[in-house]
Amino acid sequence: PTITNDGVSIAKEIELEDPYEKIGAELVKEVAKKTDDVAGDGTTTATVLAQALVREGLRNVAAGANPLGLKRGIEKAVEKVTETLLKSAKEVETKDQIAATAAISAGDQSIGDLIAEAMDKVGNEGVITVEESNTFGLQLELTEGMRFDKG
C-alpha cells in the first residue's frame, strides 16, 4: 500500500457507486488535479475547501437558497480572497528562501536544499525535472541546452 497525505493522490483513488456521489468525487478530483497542475502543491487544502463548499452549498440549496445566488457569492468571495492573498504574497528570492519553501513542500530539508541548488544553477526561466530512481540518495544532474529522452 502507498502511504500519502497528498490530496491529488488520494482524490485519484476515490471510486464511488452512487451516481450523485460519483459526480461530487469527480469534482473534487478535478479540483485536486487543477491545483496540482497550476501550483504543484496545496492539493489537500484545495480538496478540503472544495468538499466544504459542496457540503455547505447543498445544505443552503436544501434550505431554499438560490443556487445562482450562491454561485455569484462564491465568485465574489474568490475575488476577495485572491486579492488579499496577492497583497500578502512575498517573493521568494534568495537561495535560503527557495530551500526553505521547497523543503516545506517536499517535507524534506535535503530535497529542499537540492532544489534550491538546481534553481540557483538554471535560474528562474530554467526547467527542473524531479524523477524517482532505483538508486539510493539524491542526485542533481544539470543538462545545458535541450535534451530528448526518446525519438
Swiss-Prot record:
GO terms for cellular component: cytoplasm. Keywords: ATP-binding, Chaperone, Cytoplasm, Isomerase, Nucleotide-binding, Stress response. It catalyses: ATP + H2O + a folded polypeptide = ADP + phosphate + an unfolded polypeptide. ATP binds at D41, G42, T43, T44, T45. GO terms for molecular function: ATP binding; ATP-dependent protein folding chaperone; isomerase activity. Gene3D superfamilies: GroEL-like equatorial domain (1.10.560.10), TCP-1-like chaperonin intermediate domain (3.30.260.10). It is an enzyme of class 5 (isomerase). This is Chaperonin GroEL. It comes from Mycobacterium avium. The gene is groEL.
